[in-house]
Amino acid sequence: GRAAVSTWNGDVWLVSGIDEDLDRLEWRRFATGLFDPLGLRIVDDVVYVHGRDGLTRLIDINGDGEADCYENFNNQVYITPAFHEFAFDLQTDDEGNFYFTKGAPVNPGGRGFMKIVPHHGTILKVSKDGSTIETIATGMRAPNGLGVSPTGIITSGDNEGTYMPRCRLNWIEEPGYYAGVKDTAHRAPVPDQPALARCWMPMEVDNSSGGQVWVTGKGWPDLQGRLLHNSYGTCSTYLVLPERV
């Protein structure tokens, strides 16, 4: 098999030779010079990358294994010099719309925030054709990853810090979700209470949340349709056990 991997340093690599043994992997740089690309999605065999300056479509015109065209797919996202406004993840729904998250501009040292702009601490949606962008959820600190279910439920983690006592798992079924960070609420008045988290995670379980994955393939039949949560901080994967009461 093959995979595409983006790095914070600005590269996209194609990895071939993926099998059970993983003893003959070949890496080839497909693209370079991107702006902190922490999200990547392959749609119809075309690589889309999410960087701090928006979404880029990478096209290999002559078939030599390297991107020749770096197409500006959507650049409507706000950007600032803040080091912490990370551009996290890139997912799609069944209709082809794109979803990603934008970190809040945490001050060096971790307490408080630098200048806030409208897309800080949010989950954003870009239309299938790249023409529009809209905010789905606000009030986040560092939503390092998300997931989109086959039925359209959006999930995300968030990392502990200012206004975020522990890492939480957000469960978003409709636009307007507010996770609790007042500086990134982007609405007036600011809600008195945040939306309920699906769960809060102790530090020893997760001290820096990653994204989520809905199991849809046949490789793990016992987990079919279930949600997995990934922890960046503890390098772990957890099975989420939701219960509606």
State where each predicted segment sits.
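Beta-propeller domains with acidic blade repeats across secreted/periplasmic ectodomains
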Residues: 1-245
